[in-house]
Amino acid sequence: MSRWLTLLEAAKQQGASDVFFSTGNPPMMRVHGLLCTFADATVFSSDEVAAGLNDMLSAQQRLHFSASADIDFAIEVSELGRFRVNAFQHHNGLGVVLRVLAQSPPALADLTAADAMAKSVLIDWADHVSGLVLFSGRSGCGKSSTQAALVERINSNGKRHVITVEDPIEYVHKSRGGLVHQREVGWHVQSFERALGAALRENPDVIVVGELRDTRSVQLALEAAETGHLVLATCHAGNAINSVSRLLEAVPAAQRSSARGLLAQSLIGIVFQCLLPTESGGRVAAFELLQATPAVRNLIREDKPMQILSAMQTGKTGGMRTIHQALEALADAGIVAKRCVADYARAY
């Protein structure tokens, strides 16, 4: 694995977010959203990829990978830090993608340094005693980092019991003002459903869900939010409004009306985000913010999600804005080039 370690160290020095090792291909990395090669890197053989992966897996994980042909897990490499890993079979052999994780959870102030409005709204949401906050976006948009930043703020401000359910655990939270228990699906508990059901009996104040993936997880999250818990969950969606539809589509049609009522009652807000390249060479998040105002709650209850857009467009003073308004604000501040904003705006 020594070659892997050398490459991972080089990737971190160049600010890479992801590293790719694949049979029959040279190693690659993603820097500021762009895929690029390592200097003078040679093609990986099947044996090299297999040996490196084998060194990272526990005996239990090897059995899992042998049976399912793919696996998600997280590791900590001495002197290099933590990585989220996905390994899979492909037509040419093995592929391994490593996401570089920070040594400690990100600070909300850092993630929202260019966006005072998003910072204020997220802090307000974190101070709620109960309800549901959704972190939405496409893969690789940074929603897990924003969720972790909010958990860290809760952990550092006040005495609350936080239970996380993750697959895998990405950021490690040390109990500070309160108490944090992190559970990894497949390692500490069999499934999201089982972990969420158990969490309701473990006297939490805050329940953090890596992703709402199925009917039962959605139902349990809504139940938890309705019964006095603050629930922070992620979902994959194309915008904040689409998050509402995606969440409800996970529930069987016969139960959807009831779930819609629970969501309308318990929702605090939805933050949708995307990452853009900055003028200075890094990346910055653009945050779309949907607040569960009385008007928004009524539109959810009445199954009129598309009418929520007009409420967002006119609700800036109430802590709401669309992704297009967020993109324009970054361009106006000179943080992101206007041509870049135009390209991203077409995608949303």
Predicted regions: what is each one?
Residues 1-348:
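Short, flexible helix-loop junctions that flank or precede catalytic/ligand sites
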